[in-house]
Amino acid sequence: MPRPISRRSLLMGMSSVSALAMLSGCSSGPRATDRSEQLVWSTYGVGTGTYNDLAAVANTLTGRTGRQIRLMTSDTGIGRLAPLINGTAQYSRAGDEYYYAFEGNDEFTSETWGPQPVRLVWTPPGNYGVLVRKDSGIEKVEDLKGKKYPRLVASTSMNRKLEGILNYGGLTGSDVEFVDISYGGQIEGLKTGQIDALYQNVVGANIEELASQYPVHWLDLGGNDQSKYETWEELAPMVRPGRFVNGAGMDEGESAVNMQYTIPLTTLAERPNDEVTRLATALDENFDYFKSATPDAKNFAFDRILLEPLVVPFHDAMVEFLQQKKRWTPGLQARNDALLERERLMMAEWPGFWEENGDNDNVRTMWVEWKRDNLPALPPINDVPEPSENGGAA
């Protein structure tokens, strides 16, 4: 019987993984012989917590099901999502770009893109926030005033979250010195003093290595003052405050609150239902084989996946899977249906909108304003219980 992947063996194996890596099973098992059984998943760069999680999952599914899975990596949001849209990849774990692509916002407000039929498949929770060195003198968000703050290259979603974190502390972009830097370059930037803070997953090989070299501190985003979060709905509607433990550099028993959201495994609406069902079933049934491979792998458990905030519809096959597993609710169905109708209206409007306004320098703002003025509000979800032991419920 195949053995579960250990975290140590996974990290050792990843040291030689290239940007486009074929992950073969770590043990004996059935093997696919037809190229149609190969899949490509796009995601973050090697060494990030997000990559580590997906490598463990892909390695396990390759070994257990025989379907070969390759990981394609990129350090930018567009670079992670473009392979999904152009057909190079069949699935993507690409950060909040899935939301902006669905909405056709920001970089996706272009002739090349526009609103895209993105669908959720698997939505593990995770915690992300701002980390500083303890010797920086920065103890709370308010202390970031006047400091060198990251502005991540080609990563609109994370920059919006970075703005929301400043707002939590009563600050705006004018209160900090922005430093343009890549997501992957932040750790070295913090070491050298290029930046005074970085935005990262609370776990991952790179961030843990940093914490082993320098005492670090996660800025807390907790408290009962709801006014501190009032800009989050507009800047990052997929986010909620969430408590976490066991983050890089944290002491035993220490906890903090930062941003909790899913970096989901996504696909397009056209992906075959039977394939998505097989994938969801494989993720659920083989969870025990990869759950201890990384600090966050446990969050891939079916009873922990996040169902809200819901800002992009689930794939039809995943809705059926959730129904069969008794986790789907009337509130989720109403929200999902409303998102599908929103998609229909956006796609119907888009060709004419772009033809009329594509040359306008303010086209991004105009598109957001058109949606605000013409699309119905999405219904709230009030009947979804907290995920089981997700380690991040506020």
PLM feature spans:
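Pocket-lining segment of extracytoplasmic ligand-binding domains
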Residues: D96-Y98, N105-T109, S136, S174, ...
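An extracytoplasmic/periplasmic, membrane-proximal ligand-sensing/linker region
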Residues: V202-W218, D274, D284-A394
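Short, glycine-/small- and polar/acidic-enriched structural segments
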Residues: A32-Y168, V179, W218
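Extracytoplasmic/secreted proteins, especially bacterial periplasmic and envelope-associated proteins
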Residues: G49-A56, T60, G79, P83, ...
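C-terminal segment of N-terminal export signals and the immediately downstream linker at the start
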Residues: G25-Q38, G223-N224
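Sec-exported extracytoplasmic/periplasmic mature domains
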Residues: N59-G66, A89, N167, L171, ...
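N-terminal export signals
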Residues: P2, S9-S28
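Ligand-binding clefts/hinges and TM-proximal coupling segments of bilobed small-molecule sensing domains
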Residues: K148-G164, M238-L306, L310
